[in-house]
Amino acid sequence: MFTRRLGPDPHANGASTPSLRGCPDILEMETGDFAVIGKDITGEAANRLIAGASCGPDERIVWIPRKTLVLAKSDIPEGA
């Protein structure tokens, strides 16, 4: 299902988080799509989305720290 992590391991170099099961992460899937592990903020953010954005009943708005995405940038493939 998942082929690799984009960006560094959130626990690398002894980084501490509340638990090994509670870290933001970006994973590439076998299909080439991506999965994001983060905090579900759908309840508080769904009514505050920018114009043209929407969240369907089977979707969630997920928050990840800026640092997580910035550090993954070099691992994100170019093109479609």
What are these regions, as identified by a protein language model?
Residues 16-59:
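A short, structured beta-strand/loop element
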Residues 53-80:
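C-terminal structural segments of small proteins and small subunits
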Residues 4-7, 27, 37, 63:
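Residues in well-ordered beta-strands of folded domains
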Residues 1-23:
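Short, charged/polar N-terminal "headpieces" of proteins
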Residues 7-10, 30, 38-40, 68:
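Generic secondary-structure microfeatures
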